[in-house]
Amino acid sequence: MSAIAATSTERPTRGAGLRIDQVHAHKGASAVAPENTLSAFRSAYGQGARWVEFDVSLLGDGTPVVIHDATVDRCSSSTGHLKDLSIKDLDAIDAGSWFDPFYQGERIPTLAEALECFAEFGLSGNLEIKRHKHQASVEELTGNIHAVLKDRDPSVRISISSFDVDVLKSIGAKDPSLELAMLWDKLPENWRDVLADIPTKVIHLNYKALTLPFLDEVVEKGLLVRAWTCNDPAELAQFWSMGLGAVITDEPRYFLSR
């Protein structure tokens, strides 16, 4: 998903009062803590969320880590491409103070560390696999991620999403029990053909591309739709009665409050 979420200019005055399974905290509670960090995941829990959306890619040594971009530049005090880093470099990277000095010393978590956090707090993970240019092959990317996932605490539920069809096919072949979600910013004209080609019944769609006719059709087909990344309950109010499954948001508190 985009590194920058759409936000309302004013704080909503009334929440949506949704069920906890309908609210996924985007990169954790990323409006109040540095995105994709353990602090953001704990903050999501503190706001009442029990599903956390987060991004995973590989370091140059093959370690799966929780980060959105192909570099550490935007969300840390350091610079450099993931492909040029190894796990031993993580301790020297401050992934918190860019957001607020309070979070100085926050680390980029490994996938294993994130899953341990989820197990501790009873969280489920909406894991977006990021495939960056000039990095690992699809097989290495999904293989290394799957190797960590299969050793997770069995209490941690995982849904896998990606913009990349090949990534979804690859990870799905490694574990057919995983829920797979197709990610789209805009709905392609051939969306029906794409979905027919992969074992998924879940769509993650930019909320700005969501329409009532589309939602009506996919719900009729038994598909689940989650809308990203919306921070104002009013923007999605008309869609819940039509079967919208969940929202992915930087502000889970707005959607869980009444």
Language model: regions and residue ranges:
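Phosphate-group recognition and catalysis centered on beta-loop-alpha active-site segments
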Residues: 1-258
